[in-house]
Each structure stands twice: as structure tokens, then as C-alpha cells.
Swiss-Prot record:
Cofactors that this protein relies on: Zn(2+)
Biased composition (Acidic residues): 18-27
Protein name (Swiss-Prot/TrEMBL): Probable E3 ubiquitin-protein ligase ARI8
Zinc finger (RanBP2-type): 540-567
A GO molecular-function descriptor: ubiquitin-protein transferase activity
Binding-site list for Zn(2+) 5: C286, C289, C304, C308
Binding annotation for Zn(2+) 2: C145, H147, C173, C178
Disordered as annotated region, ranges: 1-27, 514-543
Domain remark text: Members of the RBR family are atypical E3 ligases. They interact with the E2 conjugating enzyme UBE2L3 and function like HECT-type E3 enzymes: they bind E2s via the first RING-type zinc finger, but require an obligate trans-thiolation step during the ubiquitin transfer, requiring a conserved active site Cys residue in the second RING-type zinc finger. The active site probably forms a thioester intermediate with ubiquitin taken from the active-site cysteine of the E2 before ultimately transferring it to a Lys residue on the substrate.
Gene3D superfamilies listed in its UniProt record: 1.20.120.1750, Zinc/RING finger domain, C3HC4 (zinc finger) (3.30.40.10), Zn-finger domain of Sec23/24 (2.30.30.380)
Signal peptide from the UniProt entry: none
UniProt keyword Metal-binding, yes or no: yes
Residue positions of the active site: C299
Length: 567
């Protein structure tokens, strides 16, 4: 079974994929117009229907829209509207429900008074309620309650609250017996400029941190937030900073693996369990002090490190003073061999062998997981370089507008995405139960095909593009390269999307035993025949197995749902 034949047939027409890919391009990618943020160098980003990425300006606009809506509907000031929305976590519908159900209760809860508690005269002299000094009325201010305090005391009170953190957003009157709210209008009037900025920052952040539909991007240094349609199924989010993460668990994006598996895998990578496995597999405890010792030389004579300094035989762990010619020499131990034949060391050796096998298995999956991660990071750097430097250079050399070269950016975006998916398939494979051997074999087959296809795309985008970047002028075969790369991008994208769906469904639609039998037989025979396919399909009238990838499809379909080859 040739990998090329499995990923796409020898008669595949790349131009068909290129045409369809260009037709779909406007639906999948859009230009990012971010003139307000010069640090955002992305040319394209994927358009997702279940979330939107928000800058600080976007958040402020959403806040203003919500405040205006509440102010209009409830006929209250914008300042009071902001206090209400903050109290109800920026949920407009909840504000409406609570307000119209019991306005008096809501006012009492948030500190919105209908009339002052005390009269505040506009002229004359008054005593400050904090420092008890006497001031002219124009040197004192009060919240809606009317309790007067001098400007200096207000400033100290507000500054202390702001320096204490976001709790300043629920600031109340300094009078201990009063619960009147102190809104942003008072902050802007009385606080120093630096405190105003800090308060505004807390206010903007509250829209994200108190809103269950909005989260900050977890990437270090990123100031974007994401507004998500909860319940949309796919939790993967791509921020404008190029970081992809899972909305549900806030780890990096990890489809097709679920959040629980990711949690276990990340914990396993950082836990001491694999250290213990390595110790069990590669060391033995000193018979005296029990410290683990790794044997790094050929002699069986082991001396423990100070202060223990116990000398013992590596094979039987007996004292070295009891060894010599009578035990078979210094490089053998007939005492150990005899004990092993009697079964004394069976359990210890079995435990060590199990630890070694477990470690080797984990290492196999982890190394490939980490390799794809590093490949993805390199692809991200190549993508950025392509966007900032190479596209403009290629446009000049090939005399084509940059808009006609976006197929290259799309190829690199697909490579980055596929590297991420492929990375997490190794975590998926690690947790496939041992008893599901057929499913494991079929999974490894699909994974191998995915790797093969991705390598072809990566090779084309990375290596085959170089001659066109180094050319002195327009290349006659550049359009052929465009067709090939666009075709590879489309085919790879389709395969990986189908792979993700299949793995997320737990390969539930796949007849594992049939997949294993067909894969094994095709490998042994060096190919596949239509006769074997008809036999397999005749055993189940409601499904048919694909000759290329062995996926079992419903009888009603004529194209394989996994690899998209015809029936």
C-alpha cells in the first residue's frame, strides 16, 4: 500500500482543488484591518462564526452600547446604568428582569438612591465628615446620598480604594452608615489622573472578567479578549496574536483531544511519575541506604556514594565481601543465576521490565508530540516571515499582486494548524486502551497518512517555493506551482478535518476488526483488490468500506467521509 495512493490517487487533478479552494477562500479567510494596532502583522486570519476577537477599543464600544441601552430603557443616568451592569456582570437581560421585577430591591442592592439622605446646600459652610474641618460648599462634594466630604478627603479615600484593586468598582459613600454608590463620574471629578487611568482599566477589564461569554486570551502579553458563543461545540479559538487556545479549559487548542485527556497528558509531562519510571527501569536501590543507583560501568562491583560507601554486587545486591571465585567471578554471579532460576528475582525483574516498557512507550509518544510542537513553532516563524518579507519580494519578482499570492499564506496557515492537530493525536494515541488493538492499528494508519500528507504540503511550501524567491524574474511554471500548492492545501485540509471528526467520535463508526484485517492483509499483499472490497461490503448491506483508507461508510454515500475518494 503506497502512501501516495492512499492520500490522493495518482489521477488526482490539483487544478480542481485549486479552483474550489479559491472559491472558498473568501469564506475562510479575511484581511485583518488593524491600523490601530501596529504590532499585529497578520495579513490573514481565519473567520470563525462562534467567537469574535476583541481589542480594548472593541470592549469599550460594547460597554458603551450596553450602558446606552440600559439608560434608554430604564430612563436612568449613564452613571447609574454602568453601576447596574457591573453589579449584574454586564448581563443586559438580567438587569431588565431584576429591575422590572422589583426596582426598589435592586436600587437598595446596588446603592442607587432615588433621593438624598441629607440636604447638601449649594452655598454656605459645611463640616467635612472625615477631617471635620469647615469648608465652603464649593470645596465639598457628595454622592447621591448628600453626605459632604472635602475634596482632599475624597481624593485620599478614592486613591486608597483604587490602589487596593478592582474592588474600587463597587465603591460606596465614606459614611459608615451609608450604602450609596460612588460612580465613575465622582472618580473623574476628584481622583488624580493616574488613578483615573487605573480605575478605567479596572472598569474595562470587568467587562471581560465578569462576563461568562468573554475571556482574555491566555497568551503572555496579549491584550485581546474573546467573545464566545457558549454551546457552539467547537471550543478552539484563534486569537489575533496567533495563539490558539481552548475556550473550555484555557489550555492551548487541542482538538481532537478532549479537555480531560489534555489535563492528564499535561500533568503526566510535568509530574514525577516518569522520573520514578526511569528510576525503576534504570537503577537499583543500595541494599543498605536504599538510595537509587544507576550502573554506568561494566563491572558488577558497585560502591555507594558517601556517607554510605556500601560495596555490593549489582546482580544479586549481596555484600561484595561475600563474592569472588566462589560466586562465579567478578563479572558474573552464579548466586544471582541460581536465585533467578528459583524465581526469587522474578517479581523484581518483572516490575523493572514493566517500568522500562512503560517509560519507552511514553517516550515514544512524548518525543513525537514535542517534535510536532517545535515544528509548529518553526512554521509560525516561517509564516510571519512570509507575511512580512517574502510575499512582497515574491510579488516583485513574479510581477503578481500580493492578493494573488495569498494561496501561500493559506498553505502556511494550514501547516501550522495541521502540526497542532498532529501533535495532539499522539496524546490521543497514548490513551487508547491496550485491549482495543484493532482501533489502535487503524488509528496509527490514519495518523501515518496524515503525517505523510502534511510532509508533502510542508515540503512544497518550504522547499519548492525557494527557486521562485531566488529567481531573477517571472517564472514560466509559477502557475503550475500555484495549482500544486493550492491543491495540496485543499486535500490536506479536508483529510485533517475528517481525521479530527473521526477521532472526536472515538472512531465509533469504524469497524476496528475489519480495519485491522484489511490493513494487515494489504500490507502483506503489497496492495488492495476490488474483489476483497466487494467481499467486505457484502457482509454488511448498510455500509461499504473505502478501498483507500478502510473507513466504513454508510451505503447512501458515494464518497468516503474520511479520505474523500470515490466509491
Amino acid at each position: 500500500m503506497e502512501a501516495d495512493d492512499d492520500f490522493y490517487s495518482g489521477t488526482e487533478n490539483y487544478s480542481d482543488y485549486a479552483d474550489s479552494d479559491e472559491d472558498d477562500a473568501d469564506g475562510e479567510y479575511e484581511f485583518v484591518d488593524d491600523a490601530a494596532d501596529d504590532s499585529d502583522d497578520l495579513i490573514f486570519r481565519r473567520r470563525q462564526q462562534n467567537y469574535s476577537v476583541l481589542s480594548e477599543a472593541d470592549i469599550c464600544k460594547l460597554q458603551e452600547d450596553d450602558i446606552s441601552r440600559i439608560s434608554t430603557v430604564l430612563s436612568i443616568s449613564r452613571n447609574s446604568s454602568a453601576i447596574l451592569l457591573r453589579h449584574y456582570n454586564w448581563c443586559v437581560s438580567r438587569v431588565h428582569d431584576e429591575w422590572f421585577a422589583d426596582e426598589e430591591k435592586v436600587r437598595d442592592a446596588v446603592g442607587l438612591l432615588e433621593k438624598p439622605v441629607v440636604d447638601f446646600p449649594t452655598d454656605g459652610e459645611l463640616d467635612c465628615g472625615i477631617c471635620f474641618e469647615t469648608f465652603l460648599s464649593d470645596k465639598l462634594h457628595a454622592a447621591a446620598c448628600g453626605h459632604p466630604f472635602c475634596d482632599s478627603c475624597w481624593e485620599g479615600y478614592i486613591t486608597t480604594a483604587i490602589n487596593d484593586g478592582p474592588g474600587c468598582l463597587t465603591l460606596r459613600c465614606p459614611d459608615p452608615s451609608c450604602r450609596a454608590a460612588v460612580g465613575q463620574d465622582m472618580i473623574n471629578l476628584l481622583a488624580p489622573d493616574k488613578d483615573k487611568q487605573k480605575y478605567t482599566s479596572y472598569f474595562v477589564r470587568s467587562y471581560v472578567e465578569d462576563n461568562r461569554k468573554t475571556k482574555w486570551c491566555p497568551a503572555p502579553g496579549c491584550d485581546y479578549a474573546v467573545n464566545f458563543v457558549v454551546g457552539s461545540g467547537n471550543y478552539d479559538v484563534n486569537c489575533r496574536c496567533c495563539y490558539s487556545f481552548c475556550w473550555n479549559c484555557a489550555e492551548e487548542a487541542h482538538r481532537p483531544v478532549d479537555c480531560d485527556t489534555v489535563s492528564k497528558w499535561v500533568l503526566k509531562n510535568s509530574a514525577e511519575s516518569e522520573n520514578m519510571n526511569w528510576i525503576l527501569a534504570n537503577s537499583k536501590p543500595c541494599p543498605k541506604c536504599k538510595r537509587p543507583i544507576e550502573k554506568n560501568q561494566g563491572c558488577m562491583h558497585i560502591t555507594c556514594t558517601p556517607p554510605c560507601k556500601f560495596e555490593f554486587c549489582w546482580l544479586c545486591l549481596g555484600a561484595w565481601t561475600e563474592h569472588g571465585e566462589k560466586t562465579g567471578g567478578f563479572y558474573a554471579c552464579n548466586r544471582y543465576e541460581a536465585a533467578k532460576q528459583d524465581g526469587i528475582y522474578d517479581e523484581t525483574e518483572k516490575r523493572r521490565e514493566m517500568a522500562k516498557n512503560s517509560l519507552e512507550r511514553y517516550t515514544h509518544y512524548y518525543e513525537r508530540w514535542a517534535t510536532n510542537q517545535s515544528s509548529r513553532q518553526k512554521a509560525l516563524l516561517d509564516l510571519k516571515k512570509m507575511q512580512t518579507d517574502d510575499i512582497e519580494k515574491l510579488s516583485d519578482i513574479q510581477c503578481q499582486p500580493e492578493s494573488q499570492l495569498k494561496f501561500i499564506i493559506e498553505a502556511w496557515l494550514q501547516i501550522v494548524e495541521c502540526r497542532r492537530v498532529l501533535k495532539w493525536t499522539y496524546a490521543y494515541g497514548f490513551y487508547i486502551p491496550d485491549q482495543e488493538h484493532g482501533k489502535r492499528v487503524f488509528f496509527e494508519y490514519l495518523q501515518g497518512e496524515a503525517e505523510s500528507g502534511l510532509e508533502r504540503l510542508h515540503q512544497c511550501a518550504e522547499k519548492e517555493l525557494l527557486p521562485y524567491l531566488d529567481a531573477k524574474g517571472p517564472s514560466e511554471d509559477f502557475n503550475e506551482f500555484r495549482t500544486k500548492l493550492a491543491g495540496l492545501t485543499s486535500v490536506t485540509k479536508n483529510y485533517f478535518e475528517n481525521l479530527v471528526r473521526a477521532l472526536e467520535n472515538g472512531l465509533s463508526d469504524v469497524n476496528s476488526h475489519d480495519a485491522y484485517d484489511r490493513t494487515s492483509s494489504s500490507k502483506s499483499l503489497g496492495g488492495k483488490t476490488k474483489g476483497s472490497s466487494s467481499k467486505a461490503s457484502s457482509s454488511d448491506s448498510s455500509h461499504w468500506p473505502c478501498e483507500y483508507c478502510t473507513y466504513v461508510n454508510p451505503r447512501s454515500t458515494t464518497i468516503c467521509q474520511m479520505c474523500e475518494h470515490g466509491r
